[in-house]
Every structure is written in C-alpha cells, then in structure tokens.
Amino acid sequence: MNSRPTWIQVEFIRGSRTFVNLCWACILVCGATGFLLVGFSSCIGKDLIPILSSKQIAFIPQGLVMCFYGIAGLFLGLYLCCTVFWNVGSGYNYFDKREGISSIFRWGFPGKNRRIHIRLILGDIEAVGLRSQEGLFPSRILYLKVRGRQSIPLTRIGENSTPEYMEEKAAELARFLRISIEGF
C-alpha cells in the first residue's frame, strides 16, 4: 500500500557517505601515515616501521619529500573523512502540486551555510533539463530550468547512471510537474 499522496513527490539524494569514499579515506590515511613515518625515520636515523628500512633514504631530498607527501595525504584523507562524516551533498528534492511549491535541500560543510535550502514556486519552473556528456568520463545531470535563475542541479555530479535511467527520471518529473524536457 502506497501512503504517499499523488500531489507530492519526494526524492532523497545520497551524499558523500558511501562505502567507496570510506575506503578511499582509509587508504589515503594509511598510505600517508606510511610516507610520513618513513620520511621521519630517515630524519632521526631509526626505523619507526620495522619492515621498512630507512637507512637507504637520505633525509634531504627523499625523506623531506616523503614527509611532505605524508602530510599532504593526511590532510586529503582527513578532508575525505570529514565529508563522509558530515554526509555532504545529501538531501532531498520535494515537489508539492497542491501547495505549488518546490523545496530542494542539501547538507553542506559546517558553518553558516551548512543547510542549503532552495524554495521555488512551481509556476517559475520552465523545464526539466538533462545535460549529457559522453567520452572518457561520461556524466549526466538532471536539472531544473527556473525563470530568472541559474539552472539548479537535482542529481549528484558524480552520479554515474545509465542514459535510460536518467531519461526516465527526467520524463517522470516532467510528467509530474506537467512541463517540458530540455536536453543538451
């Protein structure tokens, strides 16, 4: 039994809290820690990692560069861990035909703009757009074309969906809102 009214459509958007992002964060932190420890080992002359000998690595320039890469990797890993923890990019797209409003909500980074909330009047939405780019890194973005505003993306930028799925999503939303579809 579907208890959702026919005049409301809600789509939840997955953010950056994915298994792949968590794996990359762990790999980055572990690799960067190894680089930092080997670089620091070459500085003090003792092996901090027993299975890796730092006797063949001179501190200047190899050890210094490894320390730099280790610190940079730790910052990138920490950044990725924070985006996973805060679930940046998650949210919802809400369309209500009875009230005549649309609400697009996303979580951002902590601060005064943590909550990104865009409210629109359904009458201002001109079309549903589907921007497709093929090639080595294909991308398909579903967006709303709004009168007097920039286009508002509805899907994640890194979302890798099939053309058929995205076309079906665009057609479903256009049918629900009774507006046209544009493509690029």
From Swiss-Prot:
<keyword id="KW-0934">Plastid</keyword>
<keyword id="KW-0793">Thylakoid</keyword>
<dbReference type="Pfam" id="PF02392">
    <property type="entry name" value="Ycf4"/>
</dbReference>
<keyword id="KW-0812">Transmembrane</keyword>
<comment type="function">
    <text>Seems to be required for the assembly of the photosystem I complex.</text>
</comment>
<feature type="transmembrane region" description="Helical">
    <location>
        <begin position="57"/>
        <end position="79"/>
    </location>
</feature>
<comment type="similarity">
    <text>Belongs to the Ycf4 family.</text>
</comment>
<feature type="transmembrane region" description="Helical">
    <location>
        <begin position="20"/>
        <end position="42"/>
    </location>
</feature>
<keyword id="KW-0150">Chloroplast</keyword>
<keyword id="KW-0602">Photosynthesis</keyword>
<protein>
    <recommendedName>
        <fullName>Photosystem I assembly protein Ycf4</fullName>
    </recommendedName>
</protein>
<dbReference type="GO" id="GO:0015979">
    <property type="term" value="P:photosynthesis"/>
</dbReference>
<dbReference type="GO" id="GO:0009535">
    <property type="term" value="C:chloroplast thylakoid membrane"/>
</dbReference>
<dbReference type="GO" id="GO:0009522">
    <property type="term" value="C:photosystem I"/>
</dbReference>
<dbReference type="InterPro" id="IPR003359">
    <property type="entry name" value="PSI_Ycf4_assembly"/>
</dbReference>
<keyword id="KW-1133">Transmembrane helix</keyword>
<keyword id="KW-0472">Membrane</keyword>
